[in-house]
Protein backbone atom coordinates (compact mmCIF):
# COMPACT_ATOMS: atom_id res chain seq x y z
CA UNK A 1 0.00 0.00 0.00
CA UNK A 2 2.85 2.32 0.79
CA UNK A 3 4.28 1.55 -2.60
CA UNK A 4 0.96 2.51 -4.24
CA UNK A 5 0.96 5.85 -2.48
CA UNK A 6 4.54 6.45 -3.40
CA UNK A 7 3.80 5.45 -6.98
CA UNK A 8 1.22 8.20 -7.16
CA UNK A 9 3.86 10.67 -6.11
CA UNK A 10 6.29 9.52 -8.77
CA UNK A 11 4.39 11.36 -11.59
CA UNK A 12 6.55 13.61 -13.75
CA UNK A 13 6.85 17.08 -12.31
CA UNK A 14 5.92 18.77 -15.60
CA UNK A 15 2.65 16.84 -16.07
CA UNK A 16 -0.49 18.87 -15.20
CA UNK A 17 -3.33 16.67 -13.99
CA UNK A 18 -6.90 17.33 -15.00
CA UNK A 19 -9.71 17.60 -12.50
CA UNK A 20 -10.97 14.09 -13.33
CA UNK A 21 -7.47 12.64 -12.86
CA UNK A 22 -7.08 14.40 -9.53
CA UNK A 23 -10.43 13.09 -8.34
CA UNK A 24 -9.54 9.54 -9.45
CA UNK A 25 -6.17 9.68 -7.71
CA UNK A 26 -7.78 11.08 -4.59
CA UNK A 27 -10.24 8.19 -4.47
CA UNK A 28 -7.41 5.66 -4.92
CA UNK A 29 -5.33 7.30 -2.21
CA UNK A 30 -8.35 7.41 0.07
CA UNK A 31 -8.89 3.67 -0.43
CA UNK A 32 -5.19 3.02 0.24
CA UNK A 33 -5.26 5.11 3.37
CA UNK A 34 -8.29 3.24 4.62
CA UNK A 35 -6.54 -0.07 4.04
CA UNK A 36 -3.40 1.24 5.72
CA UNK A 37 -5.49 2.49 8.62
CA UNK A 38 -7.04 -0.96 9.03
CA UNK A 39 -3.58 -2.56 8.90
CA UNK A 40 -2.24 -0.18 11.52
CA UNK A 41 -5.29 -0.84 13.65
CA UNK A 42 -4.64 -4.58 13.55
CA UNK A 43 -0.93 -4.11 14.38
CA UNK A 44 -1.79 -1.81 17.26
CA UNK A 45 -4.18 -4.37 18.71
CA UNK A 46 -1.46 -7.02 18.41
CA UNK A 47 1.02 -4.78 20.22
CA UNK A 48 -1.51 -4.08 22.96
CA UNK A 49 -1.88 -7.81 23.56
CA UNK A 50 1.92 -8.21 23.53
CA UNK A 51 2.30 -5.48 26.14
CA UNK A 52 -0.11 -7.24 28.44
CA UNK A 53 1.86 -10.49 28.18
CA UNK A 54 5.27 -8.96 28.82
CA UNK A 55 6.50 -8.41 32.31
CA UNK A 56 6.62 -4.93 33.55
CA UNK A 57 9.92 -3.12 33.64
CA UNK A 58 11.51 -5.24 30.96
CA UNK A 59 13.48 -3.86 28.09
CA UNK A 60 11.16 -5.32 25.47
CA UNK A 61 8.16 -3.62 27.02
CA UNK A 62 9.65 -0.21 26.30
CA UNK A 63 10.21 -1.08 22.67
CA UNK A 64 6.67 -2.28 22.28
CA UNK A 65 5.34 0.92 23.82
CA UNK A 66 7.47 2.93 21.40
CA UNK A 67 6.07 1.01 18.45
CA UNK A 68 2.55 1.56 19.72
CA UNK A 69 3.11 5.31 19.90
CA UNK A 70 4.51 5.35 16.38
CA UNK A 71 1.50 3.41 15.15
CA UNK A 72 -0.92 5.77 16.85
CA UNK A 73 0.88 8.75 15.30
CA UNK A 74 0.71 7.13 11.90
CA UNK A 75 -2.98 6.37 12.38
CA UNK A 76 -3.63 10.02 13.23
CA UNK A 77 -1.87 11.10 10.04
CA UNK A 78 -3.83 8.51 8.08
CA UNK A 79 -7.09 9.76 9.56
CA UNK A 80 -6.08 13.33 8.70
CA UNK A 81 -5.37 12.28 5.13
CA UNK A 82 -8.72 10.52 4.91
CA UNK A 83 -10.48 13.63 6.19
CA UNK A 84 -8.67 15.80 3.63
CA UNK A 85 -9.55 13.36 0.85
CA UNK A 86 -13.21 13.47 1.86
CA UNK A 87 -13.07 17.26 1.91
CA UNK A 88 -11.53 17.28 -1.57
CA UNK A 89 -14.22 14.92 -2.89
CA UNK A 90 -16.98 17.00 -1.30
CA UNK A 91 -15.40 20.14 -2.75
CA UNK A 92 -15.27 18.51 -6.17
CA UNK A 93 -18.95 17.64 -5.94
CA UNK A 94 -19.73 21.18 -4.88
CA UNK A 95 -17.71 22.64 -7.74
CA UNK A 96 -19.50 20.33 -10.15
CA UNK A 97 -22.84 21.52 -8.82
CA UNK A 98 -21.71 25.15 -9.06
CA UNK A 99 -20.58 24.60 -12.65
CA UNK A 100 -23.92 23.07 -13.51
CA UNK A 101 -25.72 26.02 -11.99
CA UNK A 102 -23.35 28.31 -13.84
CA UNK A 103 -24.26 26.67 -17.15
CA UNK A 104 -27.92 27.00 -16.34
CA UNK A 105 -27.46 30.67 -15.51
CA UNK A 106 -25.55 31.20 -18.76
CA UNK A 107 -28.40 29.59 -20.67
CA UNK A 108 -30.83 31.86 -18.87
CA UNK A 109 -28.65 34.86 -19.68
CA UNK A 110 -28.67 33.88 -23.36
CA UNK A 111 -32.45 33.55 -23.30
CA UNK A 112 -32.76 36.87 -21.50
CA UNK A 113 -30.48 38.50 -24.07
CA UNK A 114 -32.62 37.11 -26.87
CA UNK A 115 -35.77 38.25 -25.10
CA UNK A 116 -34.19 41.64 -24.50
CA UNK A 117 -33.38 41.97 -28.20
CA UNK A 118 -36.92 40.95 -29.09
CA UNK A 119 -38.28 43.50 -26.64
CA UNK A 120 -36.00 46.15 -28.13
CA UNK A 121 -37.30 45.31 -31.60
CA UNK A 122 -40.86 45.42 -30.32
CA UNK A 123 -40.16 48.74 -28.60
CA UNK A 124 -38.67 50.18 -31.77
CA UNK A 125 -41.69 49.01 -33.77
CA UNK A 126 -44.05 50.37 -31.15
CA UNK A 127 -42.23 53.71 -31.16
CA UNK A 128 -42.56 53.88 -34.94
CA UNK A 129 -46.25 53.05 -34.73
CA UNK A 130 -46.64 55.63 -31.97
CA UNK A 131 -44.93 58.23 -34.14
CA UNK A 132 -47.20 57.39 -37.06
CA UNK A 133 -50.20 57.49 -34.73
CA UNK A 134 -49.15 60.89 -33.41
CA UNK A 135 -48.78 62.14 -36.96
CA UNK A 136 -52.21 60.74 -37.79
CA UNK A 137 -53.63 62.36 -34.66
CA UNK A 138 -52.08 65.68 -35.62
CA UNK A 139 -53.52 65.37 -39.11
CA UNK A 140 -56.93 64.42 -37.72
CA UNK A 141 -56.78 67.36 -35.35
CA UNK A 142 -56.08 69.66 -38.28
CA UNK A 143 -58.96 68.08 -40.19
CA UNK A 144 -61.14 68.42 -37.10
CA UNK A 145 -60.24 72.10 -36.82
CA UNK A 146 -61.02 72.52 -40.51
CA UNK A 147 -64.37 70.76 -40.11
CA UNK A 148 -65.13 72.82 -37.01
CA UNK A 149 -64.28 75.90 -39.04
CA UNK A 150 -66.66 74.82 -41.79
CA UNK A 151 -69.33 74.05 -39.20
CA UNK A 152 -68.86 77.47 -37.67
CA UNK A 153 -69.17 79.04 -41.10
CA UNK A 154 -72.49 77.30 -41.61
CA UNK A 155 -73.74 78.49 -38.20
CA UNK A 156 -73.54 82.07 -39.45
CA UNK A 157 -75.19 81.31 -42.77
CA UNK A 158 -78.43 83.27 -42.91
CA UNK A 159 -79.93 81.26 -45.77
CA UNK A 160 -81.08 78.38 -43.59
CA UNK A 161 -79.15 75.53 -45.23
CA UNK A 162 -78.71 72.05 -43.80
CA UNK A 163 -76.49 73.17 -40.91
CA UNK A 164 -79.18 75.27 -39.28
CA UNK A 165 -79.76 72.44 -36.76
CA UNK A 166 -76.60 73.53 -34.98
CA UNK A 167 -76.82 76.16 -32.27
CA UNK A 168 -74.51 78.47 -30.37
CA UNK A 169 -71.96 81.10 -31.29
CA UNK A 170 -69.31 80.41 -33.90
CA UNK A 171 -65.80 81.83 -34.00
CA UNK A 172 -65.73 82.10 -37.80
CA UNK A 173 -68.23 83.58 -40.20
CA UNK A 174 -70.04 81.95 -43.06
CA UNK A 175 -68.72 82.61 -46.51
CA UNK A 176 -72.26 82.32 -47.78
CA UNK A 177 -71.79 84.82 -50.58
CA UNK A 178 -68.14 84.16 -51.19
CA UNK A 179 -68.42 81.41 -53.75
CA UNK A 180 -71.14 82.10 -56.23
CA UNK A 181 -70.34 80.13 -59.32
CA UNK A 182 -69.44 81.82 -62.50
CA UNK A 183 -72.88 81.14 -63.93
CA UNK A 184 -74.24 83.25 -61.09
CA UNK A 185 -71.59 85.91 -61.12
CA UNK A 186 -71.51 86.58 -64.80
CA UNK A 187 -74.99 88.07 -65.05
CA UNK A 188 -74.10 90.46 -62.26
CA UNK A 189 -72.45 92.95 -64.59
CA UNK A 190 -75.84 94.44 -65.42
CA UNK A 191 -75.37 94.06 -69.16
CA UNK A 192 -77.52 91.98 -71.44
CA UNK A 193 -76.17 88.78 -72.89
CA UNK A 194 -75.99 90.34 -76.28
CA UNK A 195 -74.03 93.29 -74.95
CA UNK A 196 -71.71 90.91 -73.14
CA UNK A 197 -71.04 89.04 -76.34
CA UNK A 198 -70.23 92.29 -78.09
CA UNK A 199 -67.87 93.24 -75.29
CA UNK A 200 -66.03 89.95 -75.48
CA UNK A 201 -65.99 89.75 -79.26
CA UNK A 202 -66.83 86.08 -79.51
CA UNK A 203 -69.80 83.77 -79.13
CA UNK A 204 -69.80 80.53 -77.15
CA UNK A 205 -70.51 77.46 -79.32
CA UNK A 206 -73.66 75.51 -78.55
CA UNK A 207 -71.57 72.36 -78.12
CA UNK A 208 -69.65 73.95 -75.25
CA UNK A 209 -72.86 75.04 -73.55
CA UNK A 210 -74.26 71.52 -73.83
CA UNK A 211 -71.01 70.07 -72.51
CA UNK A 212 -71.11 72.50 -69.62
CA UNK A 213 -74.64 71.39 -68.75
CA UNK A 214 -73.55 67.76 -68.73
CA UNK A 215 -70.55 68.53 -66.54
CA UNK A 216 -72.75 70.39 -64.07
CA UNK A 217 -75.12 67.44 -63.83
CA UNK A 218 -72.34 64.90 -63.38
CA UNK A 219 -70.74 67.06 -60.69
CA UNK A 220 -74.09 67.55 -58.93
CA UNK A 221 -74.48 63.76 -58.84
CA UNK A 222 -70.95 63.35 -57.47
CA UNK A 223 -69.73 61.64 -60.65
CA UNK A 224 -66.46 63.53 -60.82
CA UNK A 225 -64.72 60.61 -62.52
CA UNK A 226 -66.86 61.47 -65.56
CA UNK A 227 -66.99 65.25 -65.23
CA UNK A 228 -63.23 65.82 -64.95
CA UNK A 229 -62.21 63.86 -68.10
CA UNK A 230 -64.99 65.59 -70.05
CA UNK A 231 -63.67 69.01 -69.02
CA UNK A 232 -60.06 68.12 -69.76
CA UNK A 233 -60.89 66.70 -73.18
CA UNK A 234 -62.95 69.76 -74.07
CA UNK A 235 -60.16 72.02 -72.84
CA UNK A 236 -57.61 70.24 -75.04
CA UNK A 237 -59.91 70.52 -78.06
CA UNK A 238 -60.49 74.24 -77.46
CA UNK A 239 -56.79 74.95 -76.99
CA UNK A 240 -56.03 73.09 -80.21
CA UNK A 241 -58.72 74.82 -82.27
CA UNK A 242 -58.92 78.31 -80.72
CA UNK A 243 -55.55 78.74 -79.06
CA UNK A 244 -54.52 78.98 -75.44
CA UNK A 245 -55.33 82.70 -75.14
CA UNK A 246 -58.91 82.58 -76.43
CA UNK A 247 -61.69 83.68 -74.03
CA UNK A 248 -63.57 80.44 -74.60
CA UNK A 249 -60.56 78.61 -73.13
CA UNK A 250 -60.85 80.82 -70.05
CA UNK A 251 -64.51 79.83 -69.77
CA UNK A 252 -63.59 76.14 -69.95
CA UNK A 253 -60.90 76.69 -67.32
CA UNK A 254 -63.55 78.18 -65.06
CA UNK A 255 -65.83 75.20 -65.60
CA UNK A 256 -63.04 72.80 -64.66
CA UNK A 257 -62.21 74.98 -61.65
CA UNK A 258 -65.81 74.66 -60.48
CA UNK A 259 -65.58 70.87 -60.73
CA UNK A 260 -62.35 70.88 -58.73
CA UNK A 261 -64.00 73.18 -56.22
CA UNK A 262 -66.77 70.62 -55.81
CA UNK A 263 -64.06 68.05 -54.98
CA UNK A 264 -62.49 70.46 -52.43
CA UNK A 265 -59.36 70.63 -54.59
CA UNK A 266 -58.91 74.32 -53.91
CA UNK A 267 -55.26 74.55 -54.97
CA UNK A 268 -55.94 73.06 -58.41
CA UNK A 269 -59.01 75.28 -58.80
CA UNK A 270 -56.99 78.37 -57.86
CA UNK A 271 -54.36 77.58 -60.51
CA UNK A 272 -57.05 77.26 -63.17
CA UNK A 273 -58.73 80.49 -62.09
CA UNK A 274 -55.40 82.32 -62.21
CA UNK A 275 -54.93 81.11 -65.79
CA UNK A 276 -58.47 82.18 -66.65
CA UNK A 277 -57.87 85.58 -65.04
CA UNK A 278 -54.73 86.14 -67.12
CA UNK A 279 -56.55 85.21 -70.33
CA UNK A 280 -59.55 87.43 -69.60
CA UNK A 281 -57.43 90.40 -68.57
CA UNK A 282 -55.44 90.17 -71.79
CA UNK A 283 -58.44 89.59 -74.09
CA UNK A 284 -61.34 91.43 -72.41
CA UNK A 285 -59.53 94.12 -70.44
CA UNK A 286 -58.78 94.58 -66.77
CA UNK A 287 -62.13 96.25 -66.03
CA UNK A 288 -64.42 93.72 -67.68
CA UNK A 289 -67.20 92.21 -65.51
CA UNK A 290 -65.86 88.76 -66.36
CA UNK A 291 -62.58 89.73 -64.69
CA UNK A 292 -64.53 90.82 -61.60
CA UNK A 293 -66.32 87.48 -61.45
CA UNK A 294 -63.06 85.56 -61.74
CA UNK A 295 -61.45 87.75 -59.09
CA UNK A 296 -64.37 87.09 -56.76
CA UNK A 297 -64.19 83.33 -57.26
CA UNK A 298 -60.43 83.37 -56.77
CA UNK A 299 -60.85 85.37 -53.57
CA UNK A 300 -63.28 82.76 -52.35
CA UNK A 301 -60.79 79.94 -52.89
CA UNK A 302 -58.22 81.83 -50.86
CA UNK A 303 -60.84 82.43 -48.18
CA UNK A 304 -61.74 78.75 -47.99
CA UNK A 305 -58.05 77.97 -47.43
CA UNK A 306 -57.85 80.57 -44.66
CA UNK A 307 -55.78 83.04 -46.71
CA UNK A 308 -57.96 86.03 -45.91
CA UNK A 309 -55.21 88.62 -46.38
CA UNK A 310 -54.54 87.39 -49.92
CA UNK A 311 -58.27 87.21 -50.67
CA UNK A 312 -59.12 90.73 -49.51
CA UNK A 313 -57.32 92.70 -52.28
CA UNK A 314 -58.85 90.43 -54.93
CA UNK A 315 -62.33 91.02 -53.54
CA UNK A 316 -61.60 94.75 -53.26
CA UNK A 317 -60.58 94.91 -56.91
CA UNK A 318 -63.72 93.01 -57.95
CA UNK A 319 -65.75 95.58 -56.01
CA UNK A 320 -64.03 98.46 -57.80
CA UNK A 321 -64.72 96.91 -61.21
CA UNK A 322 -68.39 96.38 -60.43
CA UNK A 323 -68.77 99.90 -59.09
CA UNK A 324 -67.23 101.21 -62.28
CA UNK A 325 -69.35 99.06 -64.60
CA UNK A 326 -72.65 98.81 -62.70
CA UNK A 327 -72.60 101.94 -60.58
CA UNK A 328 -72.19 102.35 -56.85
CA UNK A 329 -75.82 101.54 -56.01
CA UNK A 330 -76.30 98.28 -57.89
CA UNK A 331 -77.46 95.24 -55.87
CA UNK A 332 -74.49 93.23 -57.14
CA UNK A 333 -72.21 95.87 -55.65
CA UNK A 334 -73.98 95.29 -52.34
CA UNK A 335 -73.40 91.58 -52.73
CA UNK A 336 -69.69 92.18 -53.31
CA UNK A 337 -69.66 94.40 -50.23
CA UNK A 338 -71.08 91.51 -48.22
CA UNK A 339 -68.29 89.28 -49.50
CA UNK A 340 -65.65 91.83 -48.59
CA UNK A 341 -67.19 92.34 -45.16
CA UNK A 342 -67.05 88.61 -44.44
CA UNK A 343 -63.36 88.50 -45.36
CA UNK A 344 -62.64 91.47 -43.11
CA UNK A 345 -64.66 89.94 -40.28
CA UNK A 346 -62.50 86.82 -40.36
CA UNK A 347 -59.48 89.11 -39.94
CA UNK A 348 -61.02 91.01 -37.04
CA UNK A 349 -61.42 94.28 -38.98
CA UNK A 350 -64.76 95.06 -37.41
CA UNK A 351 -64.78 98.78 -38.21
CA UNK A 352 -64.47 98.02 -41.92
CA UNK A 353 -67.01 95.22 -41.57
CA UNK A 354 -69.61 97.58 -40.13
CA UNK A 355 -68.91 100.13 -42.86
CA UNK A 356 -69.33 97.58 -45.66
CA UNK A 357 -72.49 96.05 -44.18
CA UNK A 358 -74.11 99.46 -43.63
CA UNK A 359 -73.36 100.47 -47.20
CA UNK A 360 -74.71 97.17 -48.55
CA UNK A 361 -77.80 97.60 -46.38
CA UNK A 362 -78.39 101.09 -47.75
CA UNK A 363 -78.11 99.79 -51.34
CA UNK A 364 -80.53 96.92 -50.74
CA UNK A 365 -83.07 99.13 -48.99
CA UNK A 366 -82.82 101.83 -51.64
CA UNK A 367 -82.90 99.57 -54.69
CA UNK A 368 -84.95 96.58 -53.56
CA UNK A 369 -87.04 97.94 -50.71
CA UNK A 370 -87.02 97.22 -46.97
CA UNK A 371 -88.93 93.95 -47.39
CA UNK A 372 -86.36 92.31 -49.63
CA UNK A 373 -84.79 89.17 -48.08
CA UNK A 374 -81.31 90.55 -48.70
CA UNK A 375 -82.05 93.39 -46.29
CA UNK A 376 -82.79 90.89 -43.53
CA UNK A 377 -79.74 88.83 -44.42
CA UNK A 378 -77.45 91.84 -44.32
CA UNK A 379 -78.91 92.94 -40.98
CA UNK A 380 -78.31 89.44 -39.68
CA UNK A 381 -74.69 89.57 -40.81
CA UNK A 382 -74.25 92.98 -39.21
CA UNK A 383 -75.77 91.66 -35.98
CA UNK A 384 -73.29 88.78 -36.01
CA UNK A 385 -70.50 91.34 -36.29
CA UNK A 386 -71.92 93.17 -33.29
CA UNK A 387 -72.01 89.92 -31.31
CA UNK A 388 -68.34 89.31 -31.98
CA UNK A 389 -67.53 92.76 -30.62
CA UNK A 390 -69.70 92.30 -27.54
CA UNK A 391 -72.24 94.89 -28.72
CA UNK A 392 -75.19 92.83 -27.56
CA UNK A 393 -77.68 95.69 -27.39
CA UNK A 394 -77.09 96.67 -31.04
CA UNK A 395 -77.29 93.03 -32.14
CA UNK A 396 -80.53 92.50 -30.21
CA UNK A 397 -82.05 95.58 -31.84
CA UNK A 398 -81.25 94.31 -35.34
CA UNK A 399 -82.60 90.83 -34.59
CA UNK A 400 -85.85 92.33 -33.33
CA UNK A 401 -86.10 94.52 -36.44
CA UNK A 402 -85.76 91.44 -38.65
CA UNK A 403 -88.42 89.50 -36.76
CA UNK A 404 -90.76 92.49 -36.59
CA UNK A 405 -90.47 93.13 -40.33
CA UNK A 406 -91.14 89.47 -41.10
CA UNK A 407 -94.17 89.58 -38.82
CA UNK A 408 -95.53 92.69 -40.55
CA UNK A 409 -95.11 91.04 -43.95
CA UNK A 410 -97.10 88.03 -42.72
CA UNK A 411 -99.85 89.68 -40.64
CA UNK A 412 -99.84 93.28 -41.84
CA UNK A 413 -99.44 95.02 -38.49
CA UNK A 414 -98.23 94.76 -34.91
CA UNK A 415 -100.96 95.00 -32.27
CA UNK A 416 -102.20 93.17 -29.21
CA UNK A 417 -103.57 90.33 -31.31
CA UNK A 418 -100.60 90.10 -33.66
CA UNK A 419 -97.29 90.41 -31.85
CA UNK A 420 -93.88 89.40 -33.18
CA UNK A 421 -92.43 86.25 -31.73
CA UNK A 422 -89.80 88.11 -29.71
CA UNK A 423 -92.55 89.99 -27.85
CA UNK A 424 -94.23 86.69 -26.98
CA UNK A 425 -90.87 85.35 -25.81
CA UNK A 426 -90.27 88.31 -23.51
CA UNK A 427 -93.82 88.11 -22.17
CA UNK A 428 -93.32 84.44 -21.37
CA UNK A 429 -90.05 85.32 -19.67
CA UNK A 430 -91.79 87.85 -17.45
CA UNK A 431 -94.64 85.44 -16.75
CA UNK A 432 -92.21 82.64 -15.87
CA UNK A 433 -90.64 84.80 -13.18
CA UNK A 434 -94.07 85.23 -11.59
CA UNK A 435 -95.38 81.69 -12.07
CA UNK A 436 -92.15 79.69 -12.00
CA UNK A 437 -93.70 77.26 -9.51
CA UNK A 438 -96.73 76.44 -11.71
CA UNK A 439 -94.93 74.54 -14.49
CA UNK A 440 -95.60 75.06 -18.20
CA UNK A 441 -98.08 77.64 -19.46
CA UNK A 442 -101.45 76.40 -20.80
CA UNK A 443 -101.84 76.31 -24.54
CA UNK A 444 -104.82 78.66 -24.70
CA UNK A 445 -103.04 81.35 -22.74
CA UNK A 446 -100.27 81.65 -25.26
CA UNK A 447 -102.05 80.81 -28.48
CA UNK A 448 -100.59 83.90 -30.13
CA UNK A 449 -97.12 82.48 -29.72
CA UNK A 450 -97.97 79.43 -31.81
CA UNK A 451 -99.53 81.66 -34.42
CA UNK A 452 -96.40 83.80 -34.56
CA UNK A 453 -94.38 80.65 -35.31
CA UNK A 454 -95.94 80.65 -38.78
CA UNK A 455 -93.49 83.39 -39.75
CA UNK A 456 -90.71 81.25 -41.16
CA UNK A 457 -87.86 81.69 -43.63
CA UNK A 458 -84.20 80.70 -43.56
CA UNK A 459 -83.16 84.16 -42.41
CA UNK A 460 -85.88 84.25 -39.75
CA UNK A 461 -84.85 80.81 -38.48
CA UNK A 462 -81.24 81.93 -38.20
CA UNK A 463 -82.35 85.10 -36.43
CA UNK A 464 -84.47 83.08 -34.00
CA UNK A 465 -81.49 80.90 -33.10
CA UNK A 466 -79.12 83.84 -32.73
CA UNK A 467 -81.54 85.89 -30.64
CA UNK A 468 -82.26 82.79 -28.53
CA UNK A 469 -78.54 82.39 -27.87
CA UNK A 470 -78.36 86.07 -26.94
CA UNK A 471 -81.27 85.64 -24.52
CA UNK A 472 -79.48 82.70 -22.92
CA UNK A 473 -76.39 84.86 -22.45
CA UNK A 474 -78.61 87.38 -20.66
CA UNK A 475 -80.16 84.67 -18.47
CA UNK A 476 -83.58 84.84 -20.14
CA UNK A 477 -83.98 81.09 -20.40
CA UNK A 478 -87.75 81.01 -20.95
CA UNK A 479 -87.50 83.54 -23.80
CA UNK A 480 -84.60 81.60 -25.33
CA UNK A 481 -86.53 78.32 -25.18
CA UNK A 482 -89.52 79.98 -26.83
CA UNK A 483 -87.46 81.19 -29.80
CA UNK A 484 -85.62 77.89 -30.11
CA UNK A 485 -88.85 75.91 -30.05
CA UNK A 486 -90.31 78.24 -32.66
CA UNK A 487 -87.31 77.68 -34.93
CA UNK A 488 -87.60 73.94 -34.42
CA UNK A 489 -91.34 73.94 -35.21
CA UNK A 490 -90.75 75.84 -38.43
CA UNK A 491 -88.13 73.32 -39.54
CA UNK A 492 -90.51 70.43 -38.88
CA UNK A 493 -93.29 71.85 -41.03
CA UNK A 494 -91.92 70.10 -44.12
CA UNK A 495 -91.67 71.49 -47.62
CA UNK A 496 -93.08 74.99 -47.65
CA UNK A 497 -94.66 76.75 -50.65
CA UNK A 498 -91.41 78.53 -51.35
CA UNK A 499 -89.60 75.22 -51.75
CA UNK A 500 -92.40 73.96 -53.97
CA UNK A 501 -92.00 77.04 -56.13
CA UNK A 502 -88.31 76.28 -56.61
CA UNK A 503 -89.01 72.64 -57.46
CA UNK A 504 -91.68 73.75 -59.91
CA UNK A 505 -89.11 75.97 -61.58
CA UNK A 506 -86.72 73.06 -61.90
CA UNK A 507 -89.47 70.99 -63.51
CA UNK A 508 -90.24 73.76 -65.96
CA UNK A 509 -93.51 74.79 -64.36
CA UNK A 510 -92.48 78.00 -62.67
CA UNK A 511 -91.63 80.27 -65.60
CA UNK A 512 -94.73 82.38 -65.09
CA UNK A 513 -93.67 83.35 -61.60
CA UNK A 514 -90.28 84.65 -62.68
CA UNK A 515 -89.86 88.14 -64.07
CA UNK A 516 -86.73 90.15 -64.55
CA UNK A 517 -86.26 93.85 -64.41
CA UNK A 518 -83.95 95.44 -66.91
CA UNK A 519 -82.85 98.14 -64.55
CA UNK A 520 -81.73 95.61 -61.96
CA UNK A 521 -80.33 93.09 -64.36
CA UNK A 522 -82.46 90.01 -63.73
CA UNK A 523 -82.00 87.72 -60.77
CA UNK A 524 -79.13 87.40 -58.34
CA UNK A 525 -78.45 84.12 -56.56
CA UNK A 526 -76.80 83.82 -53.19
CA UNK A 527 -75.11 80.64 -52.13
CA UNK A 528 -75.88 79.49 -48.62
CA UNK A 529 -72.45 78.23 -47.72
CA UNK A 530 -69.76 75.80 -48.72
CA UNK A 531 -71.78 72.63 -48.39
CA UNK A 532 -75.23 74.09 -48.16
CA UNK A 533 -78.10 72.00 -49.35
CA UNK A 534 -80.42 74.99 -49.83
CA UNK A 535 -79.86 78.09 -51.96
CA UNK A 536 -81.81 81.34 -51.86
CA UNK A 537 -82.58 83.28 -55.00
CA UNK A 538 -83.64 86.90 -55.15
CA UNK A 539 -85.92 87.77 -58.06
CA UNK A 540 -85.19 91.24 -59.31
CA UNK A 541 -88.81 92.12 -60.02
CA UNK A 542 -89.04 94.24 -56.89
CA UNK A 543 -91.54 91.98 -55.20
CA UNK A 544 -89.01 90.82 -52.64
CA UNK A 545 -90.06 87.22 -53.13
CA UNK A 546 -87.66 84.71 -51.67
CA UNK A 547 -87.33 81.49 -53.60
CA UNK A 548 -85.71 78.62 -51.77
CA UNK A 549 -84.64 75.32 -53.19
CA UNK A 550 -85.66 71.97 -51.80
CA UNK A 551 -83.33 69.36 -50.45
CA UNK A 552 -80.27 68.15 -52.29
CA UNK A 553 -81.91 64.82 -53.05
CA UNK A 554 -84.85 66.46 -54.83
CA UNK A 555 -82.53 68.62 -56.87
CA UNK A 556 -80.54 65.58 -57.93
CA UNK A 557 -83.71 63.79 -59.00
CA UNK A 558 -84.61 66.74 -61.17
CA UNK A 559 -81.09 66.84 -62.60
CA UNK A 560 -81.27 63.18 -63.51
CA UNK A 561 -84.44 63.78 -65.48
CA UNK A 562 -82.88 66.81 -67.14
CA UNK A 563 -79.81 64.77 -68.06
CA UNK A 564 -81.99 62.39 -70.06
CA UNK A 565 -83.23 65.32 -72.13
CA UNK A 566 -79.68 66.53 -72.75
CA UNK A 567 -78.51 63.07 -73.75
CA UNK A 568 -81.37 62.81 -76.27
CA UNK A 569 -80.38 66.22 -77.57
CA UNK A 570 -76.78 65.11 -78.05
CA UNK A 571 -77.99 61.99 -79.84
CA UNK A 572 -79.97 64.10 -82.28
CA UNK A 573 -83.51 63.46 -81.01
CA UNK A 574 -85.73 66.42 -80.17
CA UNK A 575 -86.69 66.68 -76.50
CA UNK A 576 -90.19 67.70 -75.61
CA UNK A 577 -90.61 71.42 -74.94
CA UNK A 578 -89.84 72.39 -71.42
CA UNK A 579 -88.14 75.12 -69.52
CA UNK A 580 -84.44 75.24 -70.17
CA UNK A 581 -83.78 76.32 -66.63
CA UNK A 582 -81.28 73.96 -65.18
CA UNK A 583 -80.47 74.12 -61.51
CA UNK A 584 -77.53 72.69 -59.77
CA UNK A 585 -77.46 71.27 -56.26
CA UNK A 586 -76.36 73.65 -53.57
CA UNK A 587 -72.87 72.22 -53.23
CA UNK A 588 -72.25 73.38 -56.82
CA UNK A 589 -74.90 76.15 -56.76
CA UNK A 590 -77.56 76.68 -59.38
CA UNK A 591 -77.21 77.19 -63.08
CA UNK A 592 -79.88 79.38 -64.62
CA UNK A 593 -80.06 79.59 -68.39
CA UNK A 594 -83.39 81.05 -69.57
CA UNK A 595 -83.10 80.28 -73.26
CA UNK A 596 -86.65 81.43 -73.97
CA UNK A 597 -86.10 84.91 -72.53
CA UNK A 598 -85.08 87.67 -74.94
CA UNK A 599 -81.44 88.61 -74.84
CA UNK A 600 -82.17 92.20 -73.89
CA UNK A 601 -84.21 91.08 -70.86
CA UNK A 602 -81.82 88.52 -69.45
CA UNK A 603 -78.89 89.49 -67.27
CA UNK A 604 -75.62 90.57 -68.70
CA UNK A 605 -72.75 88.23 -69.46
CA UNK A 606 -70.31 88.06 -66.60
CA UNK A 607 -66.98 86.52 -67.22
CA UNK A 608 -67.59 83.27 -65.57
CA UNK A 609 -70.67 82.29 -67.52
CA UNK A 610 -69.75 83.22 -71.02
CA UNK A 611 -70.10 79.64 -72.01
CA UNK A 612 -73.79 79.88 -71.20
CA UNK A 613 -74.43 83.38 -72.45
CA UNK A 614 -75.35 82.89 -76.07
CA UNK A 615 -77.90 80.54 -77.48
CA UNK A 616 -77.11 78.04 -80.14
From Swiss-Prot:
GO biological process: one example: microtubule-based movement
Superkingdom, taxonomy of origin: Eukaryota
One MF annotation (Gene Ontology) recorded for this entry: kinesin binding
Annotated positions of the Phosphoserine modification: 174, 457, 516, 562-563, 587
Keyword Phosphoprotein part of the UniProt annotation: yes
Biased composition (Basic and acidic residues): 160-175
Functional description taken from the UniProt entry: Kinesin is a microtubule-associated force-producing protein that may play a role in organelle transport. The light chain may function in coupling of cargo to the heavy chain or in the modulation of its ATPase activity.
Protein name per Swiss-Prot or TrEMBL: Kinesin light chain 4
Organism of this sequence: Bos taurus
Gene field: KLC4
